[in-house]
């Protein structure tokens, strides 16, 4: 009798533990929405300085310095305005990248690039969003963010401190990858590593976070876990780019009118 009671108790305990484990693991949509917020939508506004260090396969270095400014204008994680203003070197000085972000399914973000050498504003077509950002290994879409509606998401694993999520494009003909795998920190929900795969099943491009800092907003003192150093490696070309984010501040008053096309020049 004792053995039967012990067996029943063990089964009940295992079942209860399994229930707790299931309850503690959020569904994949919750994970990707939280990760998207942490990567792109922390604070109502954000500004800072960015340094890009670009190394080709032979170790030759090029560098870029720019200022960035962001403002959220929609309800929740929706409409967003983003601007990058290049400071150096001379060949890209005064170049401006402007994004009006939307999350409406079927609609693409509006992106513009001001090229001072030609005194021309170029509209970046949807098909060009996965091309190089200022000659670096980062892409335009890396900077402004990829819409969650463009991919199907599957939770592959939830161990070792990460949620591992596979993301497969709904329209594979629009992109150069077959899928990508994101490693999302279980505590902060920051995406810490992204591996992009071709149809061959081999990774060809890797984005990884090298440093995270808690940045306090000047006015409120609220802390925002922020990626301050990240790197992209192109496994096909052997090139890599390190992005360093500094002099960061959140929640400063920023006029929406600054993000108009007429401010590009």
Language model features with spans:
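Positively charged n-region of N-terminal signal peptides that target proteins for export
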Residues: 1-6
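Bacterial N-terminal signal peptides
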Residues: 8-18
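Sec/Tat signal peptide C-region and signal peptidase I cleavage site
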Residues: 19-24
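N-terminal mature ectodomain segment of secretory-pathway/periplasmic proteins
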Residues: 26-117
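Long, terminal "pre-/pro-" and other extracytoplasmic accessory regions
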Residues: 43, 149, 153-158
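Short beta-strand micro-motifs enriched in acidic
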Residues: 69-74, 102, 156, 185, ...
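Gly/Pro-enriched, hydrophobic low-complexity segments
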Residues: 87, 110-114, 120-148, 158-260
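Short, solvent-exposed mixed-charge patches
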Residues: 264-265
């Amino acid at each position: 009798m004792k053995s039967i009671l012990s067996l029943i108790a063990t089964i009940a305990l295992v079942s209860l533990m399994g229930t707790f484990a299931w309850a503690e693991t959020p569904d994949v949509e919750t994970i990707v929405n939280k990760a998207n917020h942490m990567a792109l939508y922390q604070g109502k506004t954000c500004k800072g300085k960015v340094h890009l260090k670009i190394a080709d396969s032979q170790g030759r270095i090029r560098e870029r310095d720019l200022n960035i400014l962001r403002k959220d204008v929609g309800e929740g994680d929706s409409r967003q305005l983003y601007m990058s203003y290049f400071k150096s070197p001379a060949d890209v000085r005064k170049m401006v990248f402007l994004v009006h972000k939307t999350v409406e399914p079927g609609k693409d973000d509006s992106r513009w690039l001001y090229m001072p050498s030609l005194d021309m504003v170029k509209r970046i077509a949807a098909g060009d969003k996965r091309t190089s950002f200022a000659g670096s290994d980062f892409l335009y879409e890396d900077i402004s963010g990829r819409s969650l509606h463009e991919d199907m998401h599957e939770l592959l694993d939830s161990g070792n401190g990460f949620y591992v999520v596979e993301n497969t494009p709904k329209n594979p003909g629009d992109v150069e990858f077959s899928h990508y795998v994101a490693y999302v920190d279980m505590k902060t929900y920051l995406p810490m590593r992204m591996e992009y795969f071709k149809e061959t099943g081999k990774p060809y491009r890797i984005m990884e976070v090298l440093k995270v800092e808690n940045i306090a907003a000047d006015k409120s003192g609220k802390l925002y876990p922020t990626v301050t150093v990240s790197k992209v490696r192109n496994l096909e070309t052997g090139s890599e780019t390190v992005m360093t984010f500094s002099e960061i501040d959140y929640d400063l008053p920023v006029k929406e009118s600054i993000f108009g096309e007429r401010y590009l020049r």
